[in-house]
Design a protein with these regions (language model features):
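Active-site-proximal beta-alpha core segment in soluble small-molecule metabolic enzymes
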Residues: 1-30, 34
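Catalytic alpha/beta core domains of metabolic enzymes, predominantly
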Residues: 18, 26-178
């Protein structure tokens, strides 16, 4: 029924697999939650939808384990013509989630894998968007914004460098298209 409606309206279907909800038979087959199991699950779902005559798909495979997520994307890349939505799921609070997302997405995107991204944080969704844009800019995949370069504080500092750097960064954020 869902495939029929998507077909009528030409709406893409997102095929999503999360390591936390991997099918029991695949967990048993691979002796635990693995990148191989995640990829097999995604491809099984893709083939099921293709067998129903539909191929307007987007694939999303995610894990909160950064290296498992990276490995799963490496395994899946090139095995399907469909766009890949990449992200590290359940990555954590703003600090830990940004670090996990930057490392994971950086490793994935730097290999040319991925068409859309999501940074998942336990926090304000606006922070997720800011983080995603910064990850893309840092990798040279997005233009715009002002990069604020500031060095660590030291004994030679005669001004409140931390406060100044924060003020400059806040000001720079007002000009995202420069």
């Amino acid at each position: 029924a869902v495939v029929d409606v998507a077909k009528e309206r030409n709406i893409p279907i997102r095929v999503g697999v999360n390591s936390g909800s991997l099918e029991k038979d695949l967990v048993e087959k691979y002796h635990g939650v693995t990148a191989e199991g995640i990829v097999e699950s995604a491809l099984d779902k893709v083939h099921m939808i293709e067998d129903l005559g539909y191929d307007n798909l987007v694939i999303s495979i995610k894990s909160s384990d950064v290296m498992m997520c990276v490995h799963a994307h490496e395994l899946l890349a090139g095995k399907t013509p469909y766009p890949l939505h990449v992200g590290i799921t359940e990555s954590g609070t703003v600090l830990s989630g940004n670090i996990k997302s930057a490392i994971g997405l950086g490793l994935i995107l730097n290999q040319g894998i991925g068409d859309t991204i999501r940074v998942s944080l336990t926090g304000d969704v606006v922070e997720e968007i800011k983080s995603a844009k910064l990850i893309l800019r840092t990798l040279g995949l997005r233009k715009g914004g002002i990069e604020v370069v500031s060095c660590p504080t030291c004994g030679r500092t005669k001004i409140d460098q931390i406060s100044l750097a924060n003020q400059v960064e806040a000001l720079a954020a007002q000009f995202p298209n420069l």
